[in-house]
Amino acid sequence: MMHLTRCIALLALSLGATLATAGETATVLITGANRGIGLEYARQFEAKGYTVIGTARNPGEAQELAALGVRIEALDVTDGASVAALAKRLEGVPIDVLINNAGIGDRGDVDVLATDLALFERTLAVNTIGPLRVTQALLPNLRAGSRKHIVNMSSRLGSITLNNGNYPAYRASKSALNQVNRSLSIDLGKEGFVVVVVHPGWVRTEMGGAEAPLQPDESVRGLVALIEKLEAGNNGRFYDYLGAELPW
């Protein structure tokens, strides 16, 4: 029954994306595109005819991404020089959709009192500061784009309302990202930007693990459908991969 409900919701999302939007030539930049959800984003957007720019810390090791024939750029979201260099290489290139996907996980079997503070800092650096750093650097490209969409990959675990313990660093990093997203939506909304945070579901990736119920293609299919129909009324909101709004 749960699977049927997901299928119906995904179909509704897909039908909601207009043919004009789906058929436009647009450029999407995806951070952390060498594996998992990021790679699946690249695969599905490329199949739809988008110009795809995928980033990876080590492009030479991103064989699956390279096989798609998309543009690959080196990027470490925690390194200001790396982000600035990417912005320099992309100078003058309009970007319609930025997907801040690069992220790291956290051990789920520890409580906040036992968490490794060095790991906590690293998780915040990647999952919270990284997306803001990339957004700041690529803002000229996004302003030159026609859609002006920024999608920050959050998680249901970032919801304060839904917190039931464990994953302290990851939860905190995604809650903080939600706040960053809200601030961006306010500051950039007046320019016509739509800035959202999304939860991909529990996905069977290296981070999600083998027990996760969702395959990457199912999760990303829903997310792509959601992204393609974003409009002003969605700005600043928090959605799951089926398009349902989540509590903060």
Regions found by a protein language model. Give the residues of each.
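Conserved glycine-rich cofactor-binding loop
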Residues: N34
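Conserved active-site helix of classical SDR/Rossmann-fold NAD(P)-dependent CH-OH oxidoreductases
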Residues: L39, R43, L132, K174-R182, ...
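Conserved Rossmann-fold cofactor-binding substructure of NAD(P)-dependent oxidoreductases
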Residues: T78-V93
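Catalytic loop of short-chain dehydrogenase/reductase
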Residues: I104, D111-L124, R143-K190
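C-terminal helical subdomain
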Residues: K190, V197-P200, G209-W248
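Rossmann-fold cofactor-recognition segment
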Residues: A67-A81
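Structural signature of the Rossmann-like NAD(P)-dependent dehydrogenase/reductase core
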Residues: I30-T31, N100, H149-S155, V194-H199
